[in-house]
Every structure is written in structure tokens, then in C-alpha cells.
Amino acid sequence: METLTFEFPAGAPARGRALAGCVGSGDLEVLLEPAAGGALSIQVVTSVNGSGPRWQQLFARVFAAPTAPAASIRIHDFGATPGVVRLRLEQALEEAGHD
């Protein structure tokens, strides 16, 4: 198991909380909570050791524009592919944007 942390610039705080995915399904889960301070912080707990560069590249693409909400994201990963990670992130961000 490996724990990774990342931080990116962000805009206004997320409007709500969100949960996407289920780690028990051999996939991953994304937990998102609003945060103050104009920063998006991400913590990844993964079963794949040495995967830090892959996560960094994925997040750099997803959060390249400073339009991401200020939030704290926790990801519990069980070897999900980058496509699934992006899908779950987008689902959580969309859910957090609803009232």
C-alpha cells in the first residue's frame, strides 16, 4: 500500500460533498469534500506501489485549468485504470456541484 498526496490551485469551494465508486468492487472510490483556501488537495491510498508518476500525470491533465473547485479529495484505489480514475473524478466533481 502506498499513500500519495498532491495539491493544485483551485477556484471557489465545492458546493457539496460527493462519493463516486466503490473500492470493494476492484475499482476505486473518490470522496470529495469542500475546502477553503483556493486549493485542491488530493490524497491517494493505492494498492499499486510506485505509481506516483502515473497519478501525477493524470491529475495534471484533469486539473490543468484553474476551474476546479477548492476541495479535499480522498481516493482509495485498488488498481483502477486511468480511464476509470478520470470517470470517477468527473462523477464526484459533477455531484459536488449540485445543490
From Swiss-Prot:
Covalently binds the prosthetic group of malonate decarboxylase. Coiled coil: none annotated. GO terms for molecular function: acyl carrier activity. One of its GO terms (cellular component) is cytoplasm. Subunit of malonate decarboxylase, it is an acyl carrier protein to which acetyl and malonyl thioester residues are bound via a 2'-(5''-phosphoribosyl)-3'-dephospho-CoA prosthetic group and turn over during the catalytic mechanism. The modification O-(phosphoribosyl dephospho-coenzyme A)serine is found at residue 25. The keyword Cytoplasm applies. Belongs to the MdcC family. The keyword Phosphoprotein applies. It comes from the Bacteria. Keywords: Cytoplasm, Phosphoprotein. It is found in: Cytoplasm. The gene is mdcC. This is Malonate decarboxylase acyl carrier protein. Signal peptide: none annotated.
